[in-house]
């Protein structure tokens, strides 16, 4: 019998896929990834077995997710399209990696997932399979003609589940879809597909509304070594966390309580479709802001600016599913080098949705207070600035001399179209 390793969540889609594959003659081994989502994993295991799985792997991947995926992404200041911290995108290559490992252990020739043909996840799963074991065959039912003839949408899935006695809590009227892991929870679909629709508090399941957050701020002290968070201290009550997983979970609790990390955005999917997503990413938001602030005092200017250019590509590669790729190896190596001197601590105020760095210290600080002072010379010869400016002005003077008769900057007088401005909205 042909073996297939199915990435199984226990939800409607993957339960139907499990049964469908089983009835097509596959021996289905279900793989359930514990990435920190609030689920009853024993119940999911029992459901997989009752639906037709021959075996179930339930793997606790929380620590690996934080240390091998989330922290490296934060080290590279990953932020897709300036807003999305990539919680879902970072989890998929880890799930797919474990699928490949189980397939090799079980001598399975196939791997399968339940991602749709419109989304990003199908790409993330399948690029990871290709990178780690190109000999595995991929079963993607939502791109299979036979499957698509049977299942046009949610109604057909529910009818099939009822017919096959598959237990499900799903209903036809599902307000939106969610993806949850230790890093974030996302909300998409349903009413949220209308960009004019204003999401109410019923959408958010992790974070308090900032207006309902505590009136007293909390002071945190975050410590970093080589760009990685190694300790958090709550200066209000003295509590401390140093274990990576415990540290991240603690920041999630603090951030959720204070309404940190909410993002409502329209993003560009890899396949070309625009999609609205609402994200709650409390702990990672706190870490991202603190890490960036410490870099300000401890990272060389040119290294920072070069890294910032690379961070845009880094974020795209994560989003598009290229975690296991030669270009990602290159970037991760470069970022690791850039973080060698990022050591020290940042003090933050967390208050009603805001994360505000208020002080920072680094033993490898490149900040010279005497040089920066407005009141003290500090060994800086101000007359040197004259030559510095003259050198940088050389090409601007040359540009003007060559193009003077053509009014080189005249076009800017119409850069703001008065007619458009006058029309309002």
UniProtKB/Swiss-Prot annotation:
GO terms for molecular function: argininosuccinate synthase activity; ATP binding. InterPro entries: Arginosuc_syn_C, Arginosuc_syn_N, Arginosuc_synth, Arginosuc_synth_CS, Arginosuc_synth_type_1_subfam, AS_cat/multimer_dom_body, Rossmann-like_a/b/a_fold. Its main location: cytoplasm. The keyword ATP-binding applies. L-citrulline binds at residues 84, 120, 124, 177, 186, 267, 279. L-aspartate binds at residues 116, 120-121. The keyword Nucleotide-binding applies. GO terms for biological process: argininosuccinate metabolic process; L-arginine biosynthetic process; urea cycle. Its EC number is 6.3.4.5. It is found in: Cytoplasm. Pathway: Amino-acid biosynthesis; L-arginine biosynthesis; L-arginine from L-ornithine and carbamoyl phosphate: step 2/3. PROSITE patterns: ARGININOSUCCIN_SYN_1, ARGININOSUCCIN_SYN_2. It catalyses: L-citrulline + L-aspartate + ATP = 2-(N(omega)-L-arginino)succinate + AMP + diphosphate + H(+). It holds the Pfam family Arginosuc_synth. Homotetramer. Belongs to the argininosuccinate synthase family. Type 1 subfamily. This is Argininosuccinate synthase. It comes from Pseudothermotoga lettingae (strain ATCC BAA-301 / DSM 14385 / NBRC 107922 / TMO) (Thermotoga lettingae). The lineage of its organism: Bacteria, Thermotogati, Thermotogota, Thermotogae, Thermotogales.
């Amino acid at each position: 019998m042909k073996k297939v390793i199915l990435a199984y969540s226990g939800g409607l889609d993957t339960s139907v896929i499990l049964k469908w594959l089983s009835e097509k003659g596959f021996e289905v081994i279900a793989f359930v990834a514990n990435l920190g989502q609030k689920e009853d994993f024993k119940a999911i295991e029992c459901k997989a077995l009752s639906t037709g799985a021959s075996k179930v792997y339930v793997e606790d991947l929380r620590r690996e997710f934080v240390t091998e995926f989330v922290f490296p992404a934060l080290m590279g200041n990953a932020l897709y399209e300036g807003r999305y911290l990539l919680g879902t995108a970072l989890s998929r290559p880890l799930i797919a990696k474990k699928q490949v490992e189980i397939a090799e252990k079980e001598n399975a020739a196939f791997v399968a997932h339940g991602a749709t043909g419109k989304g990003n996840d199908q790409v993330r799963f399948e690029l990871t399979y290709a990178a780690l074991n190109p000999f595995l065959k991929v079963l993607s039912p939502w791109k299979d003609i036979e499957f698509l003839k049977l299942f046009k949408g949610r109604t057909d899935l529910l009818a099939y589940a009822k017919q096959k006695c598959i237990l499900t809590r799903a209903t036809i009227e599902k307000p939106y879809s969610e993806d949850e892991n230790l890093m974030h929870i996302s909300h998409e679909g349903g009413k949220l597909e209308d960009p004019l629709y204003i999401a109410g508090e019923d959408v958010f399941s992790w974070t308090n509304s900032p207006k309902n957050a505590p009136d007293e701020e909390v002071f945190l002290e975050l410590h970093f070594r080589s760009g990685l968070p190694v300790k958090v201290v709550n200066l209000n009550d003295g509590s401390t966390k140093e274990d990576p997983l415990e540290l991240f979970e603690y920041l999630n609790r603090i951030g959720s309580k204070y309404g940190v990390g909410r993002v409502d955005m329209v993003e560009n999917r890899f396949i070309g479709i625009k999609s609205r997503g609402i994200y709650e990413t409390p702990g990672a938001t706190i870490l991202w802001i603190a890490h960036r602030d410490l870099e300000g005092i401890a990272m060389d200017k040119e290294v920072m600016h070069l890294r910032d250019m690379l961070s845009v590509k880094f974020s795209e590669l994560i989003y598009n599913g290229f975690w296991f790729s030669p270009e990602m190896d290159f970037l991760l190596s470069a970022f690791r080098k850039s973080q060698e001197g990022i050591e020290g601590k940042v003090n933050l105020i967390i208050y009603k949705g805001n994360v505000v760095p208020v002080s920072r210290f680094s033993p490898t600080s490149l900040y010279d207070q005497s040089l920066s002072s407005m009141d003290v010379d500090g060994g800086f010869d101000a007359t040197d600035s004259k030559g510095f400016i003259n050198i940088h002005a050389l090409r601007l003077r040359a540009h003007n001399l060559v193009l003077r008769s053509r009014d080189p900057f005249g076009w800017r007088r119409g850069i703001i179209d008065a007619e458009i401005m006058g029309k309002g909205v």
